Amino acid sequence: MNNETDIRKIKKVGQVWRADEVASLEMDFFSDINVVAGFPIPLSNDERAKKIDVLRMLCPHPDATYLIRVEGDSMIDSNICSGDILVVDKSNRNPSENEVAMCEVNGEYTVKFVRRHDGKSWLVPANKNYPEIEINDGDEFNVWGVVTFVIHQPQSV
């Protein structure tokens, strides 16, 4: 299957962008300053800021990376929420058990952990309200890529 066919199928699920078609974005980055999530610390002036290419940081392989919007809550316990944008690297199609993967099963796409045991593959959600999906011998199954970053807005309290 070629990339254009893949993209057409995925676009039926939601929004998809090729990373190499997204304009570069440079922003100020304070690499020598750590912000604590405890008591406030003084922050120096903007002279310490360095420029960082956000797209290059998120997408080390832009020609093989796609941005895909999530629908659903099967991965909520891994902090992947409906509406988030996933950065998916297609150059890695062999996820570890701790990496979230975008997978194609019988022509449909899903985001799950891929676990292999007893000669079988399972798609494992990060939400106890969803069952694990066993990949059977007759199923068409492919790992489409590994999720490298999740972009989402912080939840308000």
Which sequence ranges carry the predicted segments?
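Short, hydrophobic/aromatic-rich segments at coil-to-beta transitions
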Residues: 62-66, 96-101
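Short, well-ordered loop/turn sites that connect or cap secondary structure elements
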Residues: 80-81, 94-95
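Hydrophobic beta-strand signal
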Residues: 87-88, 102
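Short, compositionally biased
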Residues: 97-110, 115-119
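Glycine- and charge-enriched low-complexity intrinsically disordered segments
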Residues: 115-157
